Design a protein with these regions (language model features):
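Beta-lactam-recognizing serine transpeptidase/beta-lactamase-like catalytic domain environment
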Residues: 5-8, 79-82, 87, 222-234, ...
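Periplasmic/cell-envelope proteins involved in peptidoglycan metabolism and beta-lactam response
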Residues: 1-332, 359, 436-444
Length: 510
């Protein structure tokens, strides 16, 4: 006979532990009651809202509402860049295939209103993609173009009933297309956009975040009566950018840059009158840029047209400039797909803003700065005269005055030295100023530093100017007439403004 197992003694919790467990169960029960109450409250107050969200997720896709990118306007309010509404024609095959009576009226309406569409093409969409709800039939049409179809959809008789109730499954997706009313005007300053409202170059790039907005969204849901309802989150449009550019002054500057190039085309060499020509007009008392132009230019509404490259030097696929001048034949060949890399290299050069992107030796435009250095420092009193001997030897190099062939200029005042652009007398002024002071004022005038103008791509020149370890007597001499170092146009004009306005250096801005 088997022995009975002894019963295990009952586990007995200490009173302290029992109290803790009671408290714990009470808290859990209270939390559960609170949670159930909260769920009941949500169901009572917001149940319909969340039900609609679930239904929308189950049966309907949300639709993006595009924002409108801000305008770029000139100082007087003239619109230089704007965004216009355009429409994509969208076909919902699932709606048409849901009822055969919709097919023929809808296809006939589409073909009659949009000549580029054919009934064969539309029937093939219905057959090959019967469940598709999004087929793009046409892109970026103006409202005037889609209006005849919209009128057919919305036309009503005297009793208010739809005249064409079986035109279904077609809707228009709104988006915005960038447009530049003045085409080529200020093209290198304004810049342009690519798909997705991405600013390329100029103000479009620098103020990209300001100009762009936030897309809205429209959601569909099924209500209690099985009707489709919609809720909308509105788009937030971008801000406008008000520039300092004066379209009238800009137009005059561009007119004469083009005139010069047209008059000198193929004169001394094949191609444009100048490889690069540019001009800046600035308010000396504020640093506001009233006009900034480069030549050659391009149409902002047709930025990839290779015909704009005709007359410029060809740049190879590696980015190196060649001696070949682009003609009509070369430009036409760039339209071929296999030459896309070549086209891109040359367009990138065309799209650059020479006024801020490129550097050059300033030459004799540096001479007023040298005179101002000496006068400001006190090492020049203003009544000195310096002798031009026609030639001067510095560090073993013979440096000539530009008028050397006609003899020496003789004794010249500071003003006469600048007026006659005499290299020799400017060298003598620089020697009086000295290397240390000369370099100090080069920095004061911002040479070698960025101006921080509000345009993308300002060139760095820190390595293109002399410093205390690279400037000797010869470099001091050549720098006095603007050779041996590089500047940008925006550096030069901003510095010049400080010479004119009493010594105030204003940060240039657009």
């Amino acid at each position: 006979m088997a022995k009975r197992r002894p019963k295990k003694p009952m586990l007995k919790f200490p009173k302290r532990m029992q109290k803790k467990m009671i408290v714990m169960f009470t808290v859990v029960a209270a939390l559960m009651i609170g949670l159930i109450g909260r769920l009941m409250y949500i169901e009572y107050t917001s149940g319909e809202k969340y039900e609609k969200i679930v239904l929308a997720q189950q049966g309907y896709d949300s639709q993006t509402i595009p924002y409108q990118r801000g305008d770029i306007v000139d100082a007087k309010g003239t619109v230089l860049a704007t965004s216009i509404a355009v429409y994509n024609v969208i076909l919902d095959c699932s709606v048409l295939n849901d009822d055969e009576k919709y097919v023929e009226p809808t296809i006939n309406a589409l073909v009659s209103c949009f000549p580029d569409l054919t009934s064969e093409q539309l029937y093939s969409y219905l057959k090959d993609s019967p469940d598709s709800r999004y087929i793009v039939l046409a892109k970026r049409l103006s409202y005037d173009t889609i209006q005849p179809f919209v009128n057919l959809q919305e036309e009503r008789d005297e009793k208010g009933k739809l005249v064409n109730p079986y035109i279904k499954g077609v809707w228009f997706e709104k988006e915005y297309q960038r447009q530049y009313p003045y085409g080529k005007l200020a093209s290198s300053v304004i810049g342009f956009t690519t798909s997705g409202n991405l600013g390329i170059n100029g103000l479009e790039n620098y103020y990209d975040d300001t100009l762009n907005g936030i897309n809205g969204r429209q959601y569909g849901y099924i209500d209690g009566d099985d009707n489709l309802q919609r809720t909308t989150e509105a788009a937030v449009d971008g801000y406008n950018v008000y520039s300092t550019i004066d379209a009238t002054i800009q137009g005059i500057v561009e007119k004469y840059l083009k005139k010069y190039n047209d008059e000198n085309k193929d004169s001394t060499r094949e191609g444009n009158g100048a490889q690069d020509a540019a001009c800046i007009v600035m308010d000396v008392h504020s640093g506001e840029v009233l006009a900034m132009a480069s030549y050659p230019t391009f149409d902002l509404n047709d930025t990839r047209n290779p015909e704009a490259l005709i007359g410029s030097k060809l740049i190879d696929v590696s980015g190196n400039s060649t001696d070949t001048v682009i003609n009509e034949e070369i430009a036409a060949s760039m339209k071929q797909e296999e030459n896309n890399d070549l086209l891109v290299q040359n367009l990138n050069a065309l799209w650059k803003n020479y006024c801020i992107n490129s550097t050059y030796e300033p030459g004799s435009t540096m001479k007023p700065f040298v005179a101002a250095m000496g006068l400001e420092d006190g090492r020049l009193k203003g009544d000195e005269s310096f002798e031009c001997t026609g030639i001067i030897e510095i560090g073993g190099y013979k440096i000539r005055c530009h008028n050397y062939t006609n003899g020496a200029e003789g004794w010249l005042s500071i003003g006469e030295s600048i007026e006659r652009s005499c290299n020799v007398t400017l060298i003598r002024m620089a020697q009086v100023i000295g290397i240390d002071e000369f370099l100090k004022y080069m920095s004061e005038y911002n040479f070698g530093l960025k101006t921080n103008i509000d345009l993308a791509g300002e060139a760095r020149t820190a390595s293109l100017v002399f410093n205390s370890s690279t400037m000797g007597p010869t470099e001091l001499a050549t720098s006095s007439f603007g050779q041996g170092f590089n500047v940008t146009m925006i550096q030069m004009i901003t510095g010049f403004c400080s010479l004119i306005n009493g010594g105030y250096y204003y940060e240039p801005h657009m």
